[in-house]
A protein has these predicted regions:
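C-terminal catalytic/substrate-binding lobe primarily of soluble NAD(P)-dependent oxidoreductases
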Residues: 171-328
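Conserved Rossmann-fold cofactor-binding substructure of NAD(P)-dependent oxidoreductases
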Residues: 56-73, 80, 84
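N-terminal Rossmann-fold NAD(P) dinucleotide-binding loop
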Residues: 9-13
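Short beta-strand element of Class I
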Residues: 25-27
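Conserved N-terminal Rossmann-fold NAD(P)-binding element of oxidoreductases
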Residues: 1-7
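Helix N-cap at the beta1-alpha1 junction of Rossmann-like dinucleotide-binding domains, i.e.
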Residues: 31-35
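Glycine-/Pro-rich loop/turn segments that contact NAD(P) or position catalytic residues
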Residues: 82-198
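Rossmann-fold cofactor-recognition segment
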Residues: 45-60
Length: 328
């Protein structure tokens, strides 16, 4: 069962359907069933996978639980919003189904007093201020173990493949790894003045936040885009890349013994950065609700409605990406 039907979900479903021998049956479930139906229609006649669709509100554990019990999947792939990780994990625990996701939990309402108290305590203890971290999901580890279930977190490319690269390098090439630099270069061009490659709300919150890296057992935090490097990426060329906080730093620091420093860099063009800074300066990246003409809206969610749908970018994008790790 795939929960979510955005850009990442579309890619995941297409890849599953290219492997029909493994994924013989597949349900796509999302808040908007028409999007699931449209994705199913794209694949009709192109795959042997039997696809069904359903509507579900991933914020509601009871709805998720009922749908999972009805369909009885072997595993749930969560490619919805990171805000919904905990509700989907809870539904998997209640139904005895394995869980997979691509991004760690992040709170939607960062002004919620209960969440804020836990968040501020974590900031003091860990030393970074990102709104997303693994602690919320790692707290469920014992429950998944006791139920005999697997929860595979961060199973995209970064995090995901980059973590596999790191584990493989440690097992086969190095006695010790002292430093890991993860480099993510998007050399593609979609032709728009400004767009994001995945959910704009998540993407812009991540990029506009403080950066951080792991060094000598501690977190070191930086201002947004403070650390810039140039790198000549194979098949892409020279690009500017910037240090960001990214979730696999947290998991690699925990699981790579003896590592002294872990950093994450991502490339951005000047047009992207200029647009983002302008939007931030006028308050459009805010997650706090405001009143507008008698209605409550969240600025960054309103912005999301104006920007191109990430799921529409694939057919019009040309170029290459280059993602990998540098070990010492």
């Amino acid at each position: 069962m795939v929960i979510g039907c955005g850009g990442v979900a579309s890619v995941a479903v297409h890849k599953c359907c290219q492997n029909s021998g493994v994924f013989t049956e597949l349900m796509i479930a999302s808040r908007t069933k028409s999007k699931c139906d449209a994705l199913k229609a794209q694949l009709e006649g192109k795959t042997d996978t039997v696809i069904t669709t359903a509507q579900v509100d991933a914020d509601k554990v009871e709805e998720l639980e009922a749908l999972i019990r009805s369909y009885k999947p072997d595993a749930v792939l969560n490619v919805a919003l990171p805000y919904q990780d905990l509700t989907i994990m809870e539904a998997c625990l209640r139904t005895g189904v394995d869980y997979i996701d691509t991004a760690n939990y992040e709170a939607e309402n960062t002004d919620d007093p209960q969440w804020r108290a836990i968040y501020e305590k974590r900031c003091k203890e860990k030393g970074f201020t990102a709104y997303f971290d693994y602690s919320w999901q790692w707290d469920l580890n014992d429950r998944f173990k006791e139920a005999g279930l697997t929860a595979l977190l961060g199973s995209g490319f970064d995090p995901g493949v980059t973590s596999v690269f790191s584990a493989y390098a440690l097992k086969h090439y190095f006695d010790e790894i002292h430093t890991i630099d993860i480099l993510d270069c998007n050399g593609g061009d979609h032709g728009y003045p400004f767009a994001t490659n995945f959910n704009p709300e998540i993407n812009l919150r991540e990029v506009s936040a403080n950066g951080s890296y792991w060094e000598n057992g501690h977190w070191v935090e930086t201002k947004p885009m403070e650390i810039k490097r140039e790198y000549n990426f194979p098949q892409v060329g020279e690009k500017d890349m910037y240090l960001l906080h990214h979730e696999e730093i947290e998991s690699l620091a925990k699981n790579v013994p003896g590592v002294k420093r872990i950093r994450f860099f991502m490339t951005f063009g000047q047009s992207y950065l200029t647009h983002m800074k302008c939007l931030e300066n006028v308050g459009m990246l805010s997650t706090s609700p405001i009143q507008f003409q008698g209605q409550e809206i969240v600025p960054i969610q309103f912005l999301k409605a104006l920007l191109p749908d990430p799921a529409s970018l694939g057919p019009r994008t040309v170029g290459k990406t280059n993602i990998g790790c540098i070990f010492n």
